[in-house]
């Protein structure tokens, strides 16, 4: 299965019981290389990804500045140190799950809820961890 298939079928899929989808999603290598992304995933800067990776290594580094992706600033609200970063901006937000080799990004807006985005992103991330990725 290609990485694009994971993005299209597992991240940008219809959310169970609703007719809703994430706004954008991507799978990147921890080096910042794009493995696959949805058509509308924001054009990001390498230093934005470096800051996300640093947060996974040293939890709390993004709290003062926020998580920036494609020029959009998300307030970091919670997460699981070394595994998940969650951020909020207005009615939407972002969830980033780290596996051994990849970063999985999900971006959402209403009517998608933070919990729905977290479930989609973290479910794929947990699967990839189980597969040794």
UniProtKB/Swiss-Prot annotation:
The molecular function GO annotations come to: actin monomer binding
One GO CC term on file: cytoskeleton
Q: So which residues are the signal peptide here?
A: none
What SUPFAM superfamilies does UniProt report for this protein, alphabetically? Profilin (actin-binding protein)
Question: Which tissues carry this protein?
Answer: Expressed in pollen.
Q: Write the record's keywords in alphabetical order, separated by commas.
A: Actin-binding, Allergen, Cytoplasm, Cytoskeleton, Disulfide bond
The record, for Gene3D superfamilies, names: Dynein light chain 2a, cytoplasmic (3.30.450.30)
Give the UniProt subcellular location, in the record's own words: Cytoplasm, Cytoskeleton
Family assignment from sequence similarity: Belongs to the profilin family.
Q: What is this protein called?
A: Profilin Sal k 4.0101
Q: Which organism is it from?
A: Kali turgidum
């Amino acid at each position: 299965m290609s990485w694009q298939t994971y993005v299209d079928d597992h991240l940008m899929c219809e959310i169970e019981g609703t007719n809703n989808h994430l706004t954008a999603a991507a799978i990147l290598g921890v080096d910042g290389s794009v493995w696959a992304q949805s058509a509308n995933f924001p054009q990001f800067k390498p230093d934005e990804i470096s800051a996300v990776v640093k947060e996974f290594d040293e939890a709390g580094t993004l709290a003062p500045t926020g998580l920036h992706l494609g020029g959009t600033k998300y307030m970091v609200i919670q997460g699981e140190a070394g595994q998940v970063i969650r951020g909020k901006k207005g009615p939407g937000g972002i969830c980033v799950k780290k596996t051994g080799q990849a970063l999985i990004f999900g971006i959402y807006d209403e009517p998608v809820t933070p919990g729905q985005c977290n479930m989609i992103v973290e479910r794929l991330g947990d699967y990839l961890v189980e597969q040794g990725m």
